[in-house]
Regions:
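Single conserved hydrophobic/aromatic residue that forms the stacking wall/gate
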Residues: 2-13, 175, 180-186
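Pocket-edge positions in alpha/beta enzyme catalytic cores
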Residues: 4, 40-41, 77, 142
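Glycine-centered loop/turn positions within well-structured domains
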Residues: 10, 27, 39, 72, ...
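Canonical Radical SAM [4Fe-4S] cluster-binding loop centered on the CxxxCxxC motif
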Residues: 15-47
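Conserved alpha-helical substructure of the radical SAM core
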Residues: 36-65
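Active-site glycine- and acidic-residue-rich loops that bind
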Residues: 42-47, 106-110, 176-177
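Conserved SAM/AdoMet-binding glycine-rich loop
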Residues: 58-173
Length: 186
């Protein structure tokens, strides 16, 4: 931290707080051990989340980053949606910005997107896990979407957030699959 401060970057740790709102996963992708290792989705209550956010604001944090193993699944077992958590965090006095960690694209509904778009404190950056541009590979991976469905969610996000940033991650097992994904992304 001293080296960061000497370069004028020391306050970076004061600006952001990472708020874990969800743990576990029920998706069972073929390559992933998380459902076995971490168990089913468990979401924190909105009251618990907002209490932590208020504490972080009192410590000087102005930007909250909502994180989870499968953030898009937030609330599924307690009758809530990710949009509920976003609205709750955005409503806390002193919060200037809210960011989201990686999202599963197929779990975002039009209602979720509309509710998110109404939150002016939400940064319009969405990291959507693509994994592969190949339908066959996605099916073998037990991902629950196709490249066309992924593209559709990108279009819906861009309609609601015209200047949004979309980032992704991919996995390439073979040269052929890497080529398919590269061609899809271009």
């Amino acid at each position: 931290r001293d080296r960061l401060r000497s370069r004028g970057l020391g306050d970076v740790y004061k600006r952001q707080a990472f708020i874990k709102i969800e743990d576990g996963c029920d998706r069972f992708c073929s390559y992933c051990i998380i459902p076995t290792a971490r168990g089913s989705v468990r979401s924190r209550s909105l009251q618990d989340i907002t209490e932590e956010v208020r504490f972080q604001v009192s410590c000087g944090h102005k930007e909250m980053v909502l994180v989870g193993i499968n953030l898009s699944c937030y609330g599924q077992e307690i009758g809530l949606r990710l949009a509920d958590a976003i609205e709750a965090v955005c409503s806390v006095d002193g919060v200037e910005r809210v960011r989201l960690s990686s999202l599963e694209p197929e779990l975002l509904t039009d209602e979720d997107i509309a509710r998110m778009a109404a939150q002016k404190k939400l940064c319009p950056h969405f990291h959507l896990s693509l994994q592969s541009g190949s339908s066959a590979t996605l099916k073998r991976m037990n991902r629950h979407y196709t490249p066309d469905e992924y593209y559709d969610i990108v279009l819906r996000l861009r309609k609601a957030f015209p200047d949004c940033a979309i980032t992704t991650d991919t996995v390439s097992y073979t040269h052929l699959r890497a080529h398919e994904t590269g061609a899809y992304l271009v």
